[in-house]
Amino acid sequence: MAQTEIYIINKDRHLSGEYVGVNGAMQGAWLIWMELEKKYLPSLPLKPWDNPGEYKSRIARRFDEHAMDEIWAIPRMKETEWSDRILMEIYMDSAYVGYDDLHEVAEALRNCEFATDNMKGQADALEKIHEEYPGILGVFINATSVCSISDFLDCLYDDDGEVLDMRLKEDAYDAVQYLRDMEKCDWDIEKYFETVGDE
């Protein structure tokens, strides 16, 4: 069964080697993307052979280049609720959750209208990490163990291909802080890069 993997990040941006696995990854980020797509985006146009009234998702076309771009833009849409922004942003490829925001992210996962056992399990794990690991930078969440973490992290391997060390990539960013900065810029990405992005 695919798991959502939550990795602990030390202050030096290296992963501690410890992680929490939460079963049922398809009921985590994947479900969040599907539900928030329906909430904020219109259905794709139906074909004659589609069922009338059916919601046609962009996710079904995920292997087409740019098919998911509108979904990834949901956190920056002005009408998106704050907790939904968090639910989307924490799973972005280069995002991590800062230590001080673990409680807020846990609440967003636990209290969303379609919360599943996976989401509640993630929330419990984040609360426990906050309690047991003071002083860490935060956590990196790999949406599903089916994905290779080397796609999102810099990994150092030994001669046998075993991972010796993992660290955040240079372009990794604090997901919730990014949303706060974007809110100050009224969700204007160009204004963000002019004012905050170059800091």
What are these regions (language model features)?
Residues 32-114:
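Low-complexity, serine/threonine/proline-enriched polar segments
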Residues 52, 68, 83-84, 102-105, ...:
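Short amphipathic alpha-helical segments that mediate assembly, nucleic-acid/protein binding
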Residues 11, 38-39, 47, 56, ...:
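Context-gated lysine
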Residues 73-74, 82-155, 161:
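Charged linear interaction tracts used for macromolecular binding and regulation
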Residues 16, 20-23, 27, 52, ...:
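Feature targets compositionally biased, intrinsically disordered low-complexity regions
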Residues 12, 24, 35-38, 60, ...:
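Short linear sequence elements within intrinsically disordered, low-complexity coil regions
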Residues 1-5, 10, 127-199:
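Acidic, proline/glycine-rich low-complexity IDRs
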Residues 1-50, 193-199:
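Short, extreme N-terminal segment that most often corresponds to the first beta-strand
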